Each structure stands twice: as structure tokens, then as C-alpha cells.
């Protein structure tokens, strides 16, 4: 496999193109912080690399941890690891390199970011194991992405405050809600495989209600973000 082919294969495996949808979570926290403390081009660059590294490490670990589950699921059996396109060893190395990119970026930003980077990785990796024992895995995924605004705020200010905490909570609720919708696709497989999810635990109809409630709460919390940050009606 050529170098370019390898890069493209790993990019498909972790859905690298979807990083563009994850970056706004971090940039929204950075924007809140910049309004109070200013921000440099270097900080934006390191925040971007940290976010890409964190997401790549999380996706790589998820594919590695779930490779046997993916092979048994018709929806995911065509992924690169179940198909043998990439090896578990190569994916493990990819996770290590991506984790190092996150840690190095955190080191370049400030000490608090560096100290918190192992905790971030622990939460990201923990999510991949959750479906084996709890239906609350959707909330853990929300926590994984909800940490991005707070992390970006810390990257800019070196401190913790309520606006990014509330913004992170809004992201948590929104992500958990759409992940419940997504999990409805695997309802029958999850039950047969003994995997845990809100649709598998409560049924699809109740799961959809729960997802809608979470999204409604996300909107409420977003309003609180604006109030806590002193933003005007345009926000």
C-alpha cells in the first residue's frame, strides 16, 4: 500500500472529512474566550491540531475496540478493520500518534491544557467501551464532544468559567440526542448482540421522545450560555 493510499484509507476509517463538523464545537468555545481575552493565530492553529488529534485518536480507538462487533453488524461489516484492509497494529500506532498530537498541542497552549489532556483521552476512549454495559453511552459521547468548547476556552484563557461549561452542556445534550436517532438504525442488532443503547433499552418510540427532550434542553441551555456570557440578542 503506497503512502498516499494509506493516508486515504486511514482517513476513510476515521471519517476524517467529518472533522469539519466537530471543529465548530471547539471554535465556539474559542470565540467566547477571544471576546474576553483575545486570541492569536498560533492559538487557533494549536486548538485545531488538538481537536483533530483528539478526534482521530477517539475514532481510531473506537474502530479498534469495536472491530469484532463491527464485523458482526451488517451496517458496519464493510469497515476497514473487519475487511482486513488495515491491521490492528497499524490502527493502534495511529491512535498513539494522534494522542501524541493532542498532548503536544496542549503543551504548546498552556500547562492546564497539558495536565487535562490525559483526562480528555480517558473520556474519549471510555466511550468506545460503554455500549457493552450501559445504555447511557449516548451521554458519554455527548460528554466527549461537549468538552471541546471548554477545552478551547482553557486553551485561550488558561482558566475555567461558566460560559464554556454551559456551552459544553448544550453540546452534550445535542450530541446525545442525535446519537440516539443514529442508534435506532442498530436497534435489532444491539438487542441480538446484547449491546446497550437507549433504543434497545426503552424501545424506538420512547427513544425518539428522549432525543427530542434532550434537543429541547440543549436549546434552553444555549440561551443560558448567551446570558452568562453577556451576549446580545443577535446571539
Where do the language-model regions lie?
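Residue-level signature of catalytic and energy-coupling elements of molecular machines
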Residues: 14, 66, 137, 186
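The first (N-terminal) embedded transmembrane alpha-helix
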Residues: 15-32, 144-146
Amino acid at each position: 500500500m503506497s503512502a498516499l493510499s494509506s493516508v486515504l484509507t486511514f482517513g476513510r476509517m476515521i471519517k476524517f472529512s467529518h472533522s469539519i463538523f466537530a471543529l465548530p464545537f471547539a471554535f465556539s468555545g474559542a470565540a467566547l474566550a477571544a471576546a474576553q481575552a483575545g486570541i492569536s493565530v498560533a492559538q487557533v492553529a494549536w486548538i485545531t491540531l488538538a481537536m483533530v488529534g483528539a478526534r482521530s485518536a477517539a475514532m481510531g480507538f473506537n474502530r479498534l475496540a469495536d472491530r469484532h462487533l463491527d464485523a458482526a453488524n451488517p451496517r458496519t461489516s464493510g469497515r476497514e478493520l473487519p475487511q482486513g484492509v488495515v491491521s490492528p497494529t497499524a490502527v493502534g500506532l495511529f491512535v498513539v500518534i494522534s494522542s501524541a498530537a493532542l498532548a503536544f498541542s496542549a503543551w504548546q497552549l498552556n500547562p492546564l491544557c497539558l495536565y487535562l489532556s490525559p483526562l480528555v483521552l480517558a473520556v474519549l476512549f471510555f466511550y468506545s467501551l460503554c455500549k457493552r454495559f450501559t445504555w447511557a453511552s449516548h451521554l458519554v459521547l455527548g460528554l466527549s464532544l461537549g468538552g471541546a468548547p471548554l477545552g478551547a476556552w482553557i486553551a485561550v484563557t488558561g482558566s475555567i468559567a461558566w460560559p464554556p461549561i454551559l456551552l459544553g452542556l448544550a453540546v452534550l445534550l445535542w450530541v446525545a440526542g442525535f446519537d440516539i436517532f443514529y442508534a435506532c438504525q442498530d436497534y435489532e442488532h444491539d438487542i441480538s448482540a446484547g449491546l446497550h443503547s437507549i433504543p434497545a433499552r426503552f424501545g424506538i418510540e420512547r427513544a425518539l421522545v428522549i432525543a427530542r427532550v434532550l434537543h429541547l434542553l440543549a436549546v434552553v441551555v444555549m440561551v443560558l450560555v448567551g446570558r452568562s456570557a453577556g451576549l446580545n440578542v443577535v446571539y
